[in-house]
Swiss-Prot record:
This is Defensin-like protein 266. Keywords: Antimicrobial, Disulfide bond, Fungicide, Plant defense, Secreted, Signal. Residues 1-26 form the signal peptide. Disulfide bonds join 40-58, 46-63, 50-65. One of its GO terms (molecular function) is mRNA binding. It comes from Arabidopsis thaliana (Mouse-ear cress). Belongs to the DEFL family. GO terms for cellular component: extracellular region. The keyword Membrane does not apply. It is found in: Secreted.
Length: 81
């Protein structure tokens, strides 16, 4: 009985450490953008919705775009004088 409890604790600790590792990796990459604007059926659809991204994938019908060169937004300042 004690061995089963110990194995479960070790397994949960392993899953928790794996989760933390993956979260830290995602934070360090910093260039992952998940498109939420619509569903996708294949990777080509994601390529069209993620212009400027080197890698586009359709995962679980959701676009995942990585290594994106986001264009700088052109801000116009209007003065009301």
């Amino acid at each position: 009985m004690e061995k089963i409890v110990f194995r479960k604790i070790v397994f949960v600790a392993f899953l928790l450490s794996l989760s933390c590792l993956l979260e830290g990796e995602a934070r360090m990459s910093g260039d992952v953008t998940i498109q939420r604007g619509g569903s996708c059926n294949n990777d080509n659809t994601c390529h069209d919705t993620c212009p400027g991204c080197r890698i586009t994938q359709c995962i679980f019908r959701q676009c995942v775009c990585t290594r994106c060169n986001t264009p700088r937004s052109s801000l116009r300042i209007e003065s009301h004088m």
